[in-house]
């Protein structure tokens, strides 16, 4: 990349021809589909032609080769031109482009990873640059390889705050292997973009965030070649002045054409006009990459030893998480940790102390942190663990949702769950997160109740596909499991039982310990209860729950430091629905809480040992 060598006129003309073929393919595909975004594709035609057939280094028949340059189409609605690129490169049959958006085709309306050339799903705007930052960070600091990362954004999505979180991150970590291309085509979906073509303001904003920013004519292949050839020791933003619908007579730079395919007759005429400008049908071959990315194996990463806790000793699961993650970090140099400036209360600082080169401080930008993790995880380069207060993951729900669509393997640990955090009050209390994470299609939801099982959860999460969420607690609680206890995803544990149990009580985290304390109270009254630890709330151990319920006259009592909606109670109710003779009673937080001591709040909201004991008595009396 050092120095710029101007392409000769033949190469420049070939790039112009390529751009026009990409335009034609985008128009043909969207017209055949009867939907799509041809105007958004046409503004980016020269950008995509120069990127893929002059600048980028990749193996066209092996899109996910670890040595390849990376590309993220943040403006995912321009998917047809991405598909056209891979047809131009010879990876896709050109005829397949006409199956765009059909249920029988892999060419969805927006990019998805069932396409071999798509690392992450895009289409929810504002997220691509954060993912690209994760890829670039991995390339520079973990792989130490020469591959570069390119991200194409639309001007409409530059109103998203997450874009600027990513801009700040890239500057802080000097990601000079990252190039963002801003397709400034002036028009948004329903109105012009706020800055329209005020290119100097875009440039000043990028420069203020610590980027090298250059303005180019986005329809000049020569200017684009020069801009991409300028290596800088900082991230680069290429601010391309373009026109939406470029090349479409009567549509170019006109409002009200967003997301509208051209009618067939109009498309045929426009295609003839564009085709007449093409001088050669000869295609440009992709330039292969430098093969210097290390071989990586992230399969079957195991703890180097068993846990070393003593039954009865006390530790908060949030601290046990930090210790466990640091321990797992010794098993593989591909375990990485990310945090949102909460590394002291989440205890990820323990990992940072032991593995400083694999800790990424993302600061107070949780949306971007999740996107960074998704980027780091692409092509199976790392196993990322993100941590912050669980309440703050709620603002990143769209990123988490898109991570699932991206088939991403990331691990999220949320601490400070429920009213049991005490005096900090409701803004810090995660009371919705079980509902949130249970709703994600690829999720596994861990809810550890002591130090031993927290360590097991971390190990299992590292080896479980999809989005893993570990819900940790602030209070210190006793170790209840032996160090050699085996745990599996979807396998609950009976923590307390007798042959005379009358109610099955299911609690997790703090409330499991309250249930055990309630059992001691009830034992004095000659009332025995069975206490279950679900371990994973998703998937739930339906068989053990049903077996326990049938052994306790069909009575189940759930108790949780969470709102009623979407938590353990509703998960258990869903699992046993339709089973004859089984009833489920819920104890949960029923309103927005307040500050107070943990014990006071557990009592106020009816989820402490006394409330559990009272509910058990009521169930027995009712019978």
From Swiss-Prot:
**Listed GO MF terms:** metal ion binding; thiamine pyrophosphate binding; transketolase activity
The record's annotation in Pfam families points to: Transket_pyr, Transketolase_C, Transketolase_N
UniProt-annotated binding residues for substrate: 37, 258, 318, 416, 424, 474
Q: Which residues carry this modification: Phosphothreonine?
A: 287
> Active site annotated at which positions?
366
Top-rank taxon, per record:
Eukaryota
Q: Which residues carry this modification: N-acetylmethionine?
A: 1
Catalysis performed (reactions):
D-sedoheptulose 7-phosphate + D-glyceraldehyde 3-phosphate = aldehydo-D-ribose 5-phosphate + D-xylulose 5-phosphate
Q: How is the cofactor bound?
A: Binds 1 Mg(2+) ion per subunit. Can also utilize other divalent metal cations, such as Ca(2+), Mn(2+) and Co(2+). Binds 1 thiamine pyrophosphate per subunit.
Which family is annotated? Belongs to the transketolase family.
Protein name (Swiss-Prot/TrEMBL): Transketolase
């Amino acid at each position: 990349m050092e120095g710029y060598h101007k392409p000769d006129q033949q190469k420049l003309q070939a790039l112009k021809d390529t751009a026009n073929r990409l335009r034609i393919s985008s128009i043909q595909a969207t017209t055949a589909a009867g939907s799509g975004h041809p105007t958004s594709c046409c503004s980016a035609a020269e950008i995509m032609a120069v990127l893929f057939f002059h600048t980028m280094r990749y193996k066209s028949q092996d899109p996910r080769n670890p040595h390849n340059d990376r590309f993220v189409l943040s403006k995912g609605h321009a998917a047809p031109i991405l598909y056209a690129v891979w047809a131009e490169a010879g990876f896709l049959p050109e005829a397949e482009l006409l199956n765009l958006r059909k249920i029988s085709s892999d060419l969805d309306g927006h990019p998805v990873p069932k396409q071999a050339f798509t690392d992450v799903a895009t289409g929810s705007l504002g997220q691509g640059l954060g993912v690209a930052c994760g890829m670039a960070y991995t390339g520079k600091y973990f792989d130490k390889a020469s591959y570069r990362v390119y991200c194409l954004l639309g001007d409409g999505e530059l109103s998203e705050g997450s874009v600027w979180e990513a801009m700040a991150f890239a500057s802080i970590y000097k990601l000079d292997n990252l190039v963002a291309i801003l397709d400034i085509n002036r028009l948004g979906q329903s109105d012009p973009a706020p800055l329209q073509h005020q290119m100097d303001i875009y440039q000043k904003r990028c420069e203020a965030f610590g980027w090298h920013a250059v303005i180019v004519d986005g329809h000049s292949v020569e200017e684009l070649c020069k801009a991409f050839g300028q290596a800088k020791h900082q991230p680069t933003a290429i601010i391309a002045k373009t026109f939406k619908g470029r090349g479409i007579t009567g549509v170019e730079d006109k409002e009200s054409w967003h997301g509208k395919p051209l009618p067939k007759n109009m498309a045929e005429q426009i295609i003839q006009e564009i085709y007449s400008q093409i001088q050669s049908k000869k295609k440009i071959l992709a330039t292969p990459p430098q093969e210097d990315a290390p071989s990586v194996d992230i399969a079957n990463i195991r703890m180097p030893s068993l846990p070393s806790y003593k039954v009865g000793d006390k530790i908060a699961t949030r601290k046990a998480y930090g210790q466990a993650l640091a321990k797992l970090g010794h098993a593989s140099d591909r375990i990485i940790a990310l945090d949102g400036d909460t590394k002291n209360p989440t205890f990820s600082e323990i990992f940072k102390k032991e593995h400083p080169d694999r800790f990424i401080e993302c600061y107070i930008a949780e949306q971007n942190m999740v996107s960074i993790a998704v980027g780091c995880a692409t092509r199976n380069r790392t196993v990322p663990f993100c941590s912050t207060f669980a309440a703050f993951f709620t603002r990143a729900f769209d990123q988490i949702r898109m991570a699932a669509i991206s088939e991403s393997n990331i691990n999220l640990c949320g601490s400070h769950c429920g009213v049991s955090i005490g005096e900090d009050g409701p803004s810090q209390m995660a009371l919705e997160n079980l509902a949130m994470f249970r709703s994600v299609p690829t999720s596994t939801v861990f809810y550890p109740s002591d130090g031993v099982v927290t360590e097991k959860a971390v190990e299992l999460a590292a080896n479980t596909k999809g989005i893993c969420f570990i819900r940790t607690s602030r209070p210190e609680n006793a170790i209840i499991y032996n160090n050699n206890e085996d745990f599996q995803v979807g396998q609950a544990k009976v923590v307390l039982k007798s042959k005379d149990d009358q109610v099955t009580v299911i609690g997790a985290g703090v409330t499991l310990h309250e249930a055990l304390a309630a059992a001691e109270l009830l034992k004095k009254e000659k009332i025995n209860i069975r206490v279950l630890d679900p371990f994973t709330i998703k998937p739930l151990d339906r068989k053990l729950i049903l077996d326990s319920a049938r052994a306790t006259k069909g009575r189940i009592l759930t108790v949780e430091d969470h709102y009623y909606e979407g938590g353990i109670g509703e998960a258990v109710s869903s699992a046993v629905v339709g089973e004859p003779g089984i009833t489920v009673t819920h104890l949960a937080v029923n309103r927005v809480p307040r500050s107070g001591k943990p014990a006071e709040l557990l009592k106020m909201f009816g989820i402490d040992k006394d409330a559990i004991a009272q509910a058990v008595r009521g169930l027995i009396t009712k019978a």
